[in-house]
Amino acid sequence: MILIFTTLACSQVGNSETPENEVVSNDESTSNVAGEAPRQYPTLEPGSDFDKFSLWTNGTQLRGANTWQRLVDPQYDDDDFLGDGYIGPPYTQDDFNGLAALGANYVNLSHPGIFTERPPYVLDEKAQANLDAMIAMAAEADLFVVISFRTGPGRNDFTFYRDDDWFDSDDLIENVWYEADAQQAWVEMWRYTAERYRDHAVVVGYDLMCEPNAVEILDEWEHDQFYADYGNTISDWNRWYPQIVNAIREVDTQTPILVGGEGYSALDWLPYLNIMDDPRMVYAFHQYAPHMYTHQEPPFLTHTYPGKFDADYDGQKDIVDQDWLADYLSIVTDLSDQHGIVMAVNEYGVVRWEPGAVEFMVDEMSIFEELGLNYALWVWDPDWPPWNEGVNGFNFRYGENPSNTEETPNEFQDVIVEFWARNEVRPSDFN
């Protein structure tokens, strides 16, 4: 499974099954987070003029990284691979402090949803306790937070590697794309989440779903054909996500809401996402293009940056360089000009050993800056050796050598830190 581990972004291994009728108890012994975290939320001072949405609208202000966690399943997880808690891998305060020390000022928590994935769709108190602890540690490290739900009613983490064969197909949960009860429960999960965290000073965004993927489930990757066949059906994210937004706004009118498009939130699917009449929306995308370059595995590192290869699956070789990236990312400018919307990149990256990865990152982040986009790198892993030894393709702290699994000074990290050094604002500036 090492190949799986190293090649997937936003998609790490795991099953997250909740037995029917179980509402998990909030028992400290089941927390995935090593150490204790404060339970009291920092809130904005009365009369504070801090507007969370302003962090998304005035040029690039948030530069940081994603964390990744899923529910632990002993059926598929070996020994202490993800730790012995309910969710893993386990993060500590030192992990968040380390992210902040390198200059990041925000973390996108790519986290299991806090309602169960199987019916009855009810609050999962252990998932909620874990999210509380993660937010608390981010706050202690002076980091802004975006909550991004990977899973929830009718969807588990296996959806991100649905065609792999290391788990039983019966454990794959994807009925959220064809069952109204699951979709309504996802709406209620977000209503509950917004009511719980709306006054939290460091929570500056709700990301409704990590990488909507009905296109793969329905096996239709052509944009226009997908919407011709499935537009305005129960499988259409455009039909469903506004219900989530409306539910959030019933209890929280202020916190920015992030939403990505179909196709695993790839940028070329964003123009097909319906724009809502909500003044505090952020339209987000994940940027791993060209995928055949950013996700190569040794020894087959045939594509370089800059380089010449088929980058758009049309059978013709393309010159892939900064101009290619700028042209692809010009979709952002087109959408901004057309709709006047706010956008962000809440996942991006390249596997650390790709030829030319340093130059690729410099060019890509430079374009993000020119476009005024906030951006979160994939991924900031915890210091958990059983995990780090097997899953480290996106761990920039390990440098370009694929066999290295220890932190080492390297140019890849230097480039990232150089961009993070541009951060000027932190939660403590407003409290």
Regions found by a protein language model. Name each.
Residues 11-19:
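Bacterial lipoprotein signal-peptidase II cleavage site
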Residues 18-36:
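Post-signal peptide N-terminal segment of mature Sec-exported envelope proteins
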Residues 118-121, 177-179, 224-233, 305-321, ...:
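Surface-exposed cleft-lining segments at the edges of enzyme active sites
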Residues 244, 255-328, 333-335, 340-342:
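Aromatic-lined glycan-binding groove of carbohydrate-active enzymes
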Residues 321-400:
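Substrate-binding cleft of secreted/luminal carbohydrate-active enzymes
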